[in-house]
Amino acid sequence: MGRKVAVLWHASFSIGAGVLYFYFVLPRWPELMGDTGHSLGTGLRIATGALVGLAALPVVFTLLRTRKPELGTPQLALSMRIWSIMAHVLAGALIVGTAISEVWLSLDAAGQWLFGIYGAAAAIAVLGFFGFYLSFVAELPPPPPKPLKPKKPKQRRLRRKKTAKGDEAEPEAAEEAENTELAAQEDEEAVEAPPESIESPGGEPESATREAPAAETATAEEPRGGLRNRRPTGKTSHRRRRTRSGVQVAKVDE
């Protein structure tokens, strides 16, 4: 039996059972209003239970068709069809048994119990109906996995740009530091330039002034890479002392 035939069979039996259930089982308005007799109502209730039970036949045929191992039907779908068959049979049996028991039981004495059983049978039948249709949903293959989102390479590029800028900034800072050091050295050399000579109190200004520039020119001609605090040497020994104001005073050793 194909799927379409099984669905049409099950749907027609389910709709017929639902219509009969509403008019002759619960709430059975025609019988309560006196339009139909009790014997006719009892027969239609038994027919309702039979239709509910027979609605399990298309479920059985579908189970037998899809149970073959070569089809690869999921176990969940098979289990749902088995439970649907059991629900249909149980609901039909409850309706038929309760309808037969009304022959000896009156509604005044056990009406609430009878209606309770009818309601439970209807709930079980609804579960069986939906279980059959949901079994087809369980046969569907799982949805394909969502594709992974590609990682954004822009962040890496930004980081590389930042690192490149940082690398460029480092040599610039080093060059600026070297320039400042060179400027400081030039300032120091400018401060150490030969100041004006001051006459000594001993009465020999000319000899002191002549010897002082000669000694300073000798120190200026020395290479810059040597020691800066090296004192000049000559025929006569001199000692220079720098005051806080930056003026050098030459003293002649007697």
UniProtKB/Swiss-Prot annotation:
Chief location of this protein within or outside the cell: membrane
Transmembrane segments: 5-25, 44-64, 85-105, 114-134
Membrane topology note: Multi-pass membrane protein
Compartments where located: Cell membrane
Disruption phenotype: Mutant is unable to utilize both fatty acids and cholesterol during infection in macrophages.
Biased composition (Basic residues): 148-163, 227-244
Cell cycle keyword on record: no
Extent of Low complexity compositional bias: 192-220
UniProt keywords, alphabetically: Cell membrane, Membrane, Transmembrane, Transmembrane helix, Virulence
Role: Required for the import of both fatty acids and cholesterol during growth in macrophages and in axenic culture. Facilitates the uptake of these lipids by stabilizing protein subunits of the Mce1 and Mce4 multi-subunit transporters, which transport fatty acids and cholesterol, respectively. Required for full virulence in vivo.
Subunit field text: Interacts with the Mce1 and Mce4 accessory subunits Rv0199/OmamA, Rv0177/Mam1C and Rv3492c/Mam4B.
Record protein name field: Lipid uptake coordinator A
Gene: lucA
